[in-house]
Amino acid sequence: MKNLLFILAVAALLGAQASPAAAHSALLNCFDNADGTFTCQGGYSDGSSATGIRIVVRDSSGIVLQEARLDSNSEVTLNRPQGDFSVLFDGGAGHSVEVRGDSLVR
């Protein structure tokens, strides 16, 4: 019986380490302010702060138009480029998300 309890305890510990609940995804929402600017709010699915995360605005050919970092509220307001563009939340490997300019919430 003690061996069974030991095996179950070890299995539970190993299962907890491999749990997908420990993972988190990058989130980015961008809103058109209707004044020539847009605001993006970033974060992680587990509620972690995104303060200081790099935001990159690129045109349709990949040329960087603007770069900024999320403030202490995990937000940034930028000038809206003319033409097609995208906004990249650059949280590092596996933690990046991109929003197309034509999908900004108005």
Segments predicted by a language model, with ranges:
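Positively charged n-region of N-terminal signal peptides that target proteins for export
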Residues: 1-6
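C-terminal segment of classical bacterial N-terminal signal peptides
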Residues: 13-21
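Beta-strand-rich domain onsets/edges
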Residues: 20-38, 43, 61, 100-105
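A short beta-turn/strand-edge loop motif at beta-sheet boundaries
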Residues: 46-50
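Short beta-strand/loop motifs in extracellular/secreted proteins, especially
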Residues: 51-53, 85
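Short amphipathic beta-strand segments in non-cytosolic proteins
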Residues: 54-67
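Glycine-centered loop-to-beta-strand initiation motif
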Residues: 69-78
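Short, aromatic- and glycine-rich surface loops/edge beta-strands on solvent-exposed regions
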Residues: 83-97
